[in-house]
Amino acid sequence: MSQATKRKHVVKEVLGEHIVPSDQQQIVRVLRTPGNNLHEVETAQGQRFLVSMPSKYRKNIWIKRGDFLIVDPIEEGEKVKAEISFVLCKDHVRSLQKEGFWPEAFSEVAEKHNNRNRQTQPELPAEPQLSGEESSSEDDSDLFVNTNRRQYHESEEESEEEEAA
């Protein structure tokens, strides 16, 4: 299987399925990533340990601090005590909360995480359009603005001076 095909299947699996943790599995929150595909996590009871990322997720799915995971315990592990079995996105968290499988200790953290995502995504005001009127090509208000670039504003006075010279 090619790398692109593998990535497609892994992303489809992570985004599509809504799973429920089994008796052995735990829902944990990522605290930090020390490296080597290891992540330090915290359980709902406050226990901290390292989890490993399986090879199918490596370079396909990215995990950041504050994300939630479902992990399978590893019996023989001293430092690394579990392996990631599923990465939870916002939709998965909401469905687990509705079904009653979400730990109470993570309820406040999940709400803050969802609210923070809502605040960082700017909402564009909807422009009412008349039925016979098309949007003009001169109106650029709906275009994406790259905030990482400086905005240069040229005044009319400067442009007139350049034309005269």
From Swiss-Prot:
Phosphothreonine PTM positions: T33
**Residue span of motif Nuclear localization signal:** 6-12, 56-65
Q: Where is this chain compositionally biased, Acidic residues type?
A: 155-165
What is one Pfam family matched by this protein?
eIF-1a
Its domain of life reads Eukaryota
Give all Phosphoserine modified positions. Answer: S131, S135, S136, S137, S155, S159
Against CDD domains, the record matches this protein to: S1_eIF1AD_like (cd05792)
Q: Where does the record say this protein resides?
A: Nucleus
A molecular-function term among this protein's GO annotations = RNA binding
Question: Which keywords describe this protein according to UniProt?
Answer: Nucleus, Phosphoprotein, RNA-binding
Where does the S1-like domain start and stop, copy by copy? 5-89
The record lists the membrane-crossing segments as none
What does UniProt give as GO cellular component? Answer: cytosol; intracellular membrane-bounded organelle; nucleoplasm; nucleus
Task: From the record, give the cysteines joined by S-S bonds.
Answer: none
Annotated family: Belongs to the EIF1AD family.
Query: What does the protein in this record do?
Result: Plays a role into cellular response to oxidative stress. Decreases cell proliferation.
Q: Which PANTHER family match?
A: RNA-BINDING PROTEIN EIF1AD-RELATED, TRANSLATION INITIATION FACTOR-RELATED
The name of this protein is Probable RNA-binding protein EIF1AD
Q: What is the lineage of its organism?
A: Eukaryota, Metazoa, Chordata, Craniata, Vertebrata
